[in-house]
Amino acid sequence: MKQNNIFFRYFSPVAAQQKLYVAALVALLSSSAYEAEAQVGEPFIHDPSTIALCDGKYYTFGTGEGGIWSEDGWTWQGGAVRPGRGAAPDVLKIGDRYLVAYSATGGGLGGSHRGDVLTMWNKTLDPKSPDFKYTEPVVVASSLDDEDCDAIDAGLLLDPTTGRLWLSYGTYFGFIRLVELDPKTGKRMEGNEPVNIAIDCEATDLIYRNGWYYLLGTHGTCCDGPNSTYNIVVGRSRKITGPYVDNVGREMLQGGGKMVIAANNLKTGPGHFGRYIEEEGVEKMSFHYESDFRQGGRSVLAIRPLLWKNDWPVAGDEFHAGTYEIESERRGYALEIAVDFVRMQRDIEPFWIKPTKPLKNIEPQTLKEVEAEWPKGEVKVRMNDYMFRPHQKWSIMPAGKGGYLGGPYYKICIEGTTRYLTATAQHDVIAKPEFTGEDAQLWRIEQLTDGTYRIMPKAMPGTEEKLALVSLGDCTPGLA
């Protein structure tokens, strides 16, 4: 897929023509016209678990009793159920059951380090299901008042290479520790002793990829809203037990950690990382912001693309509405509606003559200058050399018709017009003269693990196939 992916160039009001995949942060921060979309509904949660999919619905649990869930991964509401209260849970599907780990007390607050990490099972996460029933929780890790570790902030990993189950736990007030659990029972493996793997972080999570084990930790201060300095850091190791080392060779046992994400875009305190793999090449990272300034300063669920660069996890871009060039990875040509190229007036002295007149800027071609000559009705779409002309600038806005994990469905049209990009039953794309709200005009936009983007219609006419916008040939867009 990589050869044919589509990526974007963003037209920022201040810094125009930034390529998102190489300068996304610059483009986002320089734009004052649009805000990045955030989860909608009731996404309010603190210390969220890794997102789990159960019977077509998404669930995440937080500190306190319960959590939030979503039908589509975009609109969230309360109602997820987790007994036991406690703090900072995690959830992992093993076979046809869900293992939930959580902590009771602990945290190093008030000078006490006493606490327990417990696990319990359920066949489903849907509280309305007749199969919904948690098993009795069992203690798998503990800490004492005077211990140099807190039994809190559980993180689960089922090693895909060995089938062994691991739990990390601990806080900023001591060591992060690793213990092994029995994947059949969720109990501590008999005789297993904890291993110290990090300091100066908490809310850890373990993941595996390409021969590396990664330890994601949350560094900084929590629970202070807009003043929280939480940020997510990472180290990696060839062995699950460490040592975990960052990008400059510092061990996490010595306080090292490569930054993954920090405060940004009027949101502070990212923490409690979780990884969600949708399919090969499409990954998401979930976490909370301690304070989202645009949502009353509340602690909220956040979902970002998870990218991989040089075998390091990287937080992807927060995609937001705006005007873009849609450019092919295959050749670098831009998506455009198939209209005649209108030449601009040229009043320039020959390049070999020394200028005799004051230099005068050339104004870009405007929509008003060319639109009257465009054909009415449906128009074909093609790929061509990018010339920043009106028929190559695409306005991408939320459609207000639901979403998917981490984003809303978008509508895409030529800027300043009602010519909307539409999928056809022939696996083609055209521009229709109006927005009907049909599934073929609702677009799912996701950043892939390599930093490029995938654009998919919500549904194709006459088929259930999931297809993406690609460059079939240098000049031929299509859906495949």
Predicted regions and their residues:
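Carbohydrate-active catalytic/glycan-binding domains of CAZyme proteins
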Residues: 36-349, 354-368, 376, 385-403, ...
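Secreted/periplasmic carbohydrate-active enzymes, especially glycoside hydrolases
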Residues: 1-2, 35
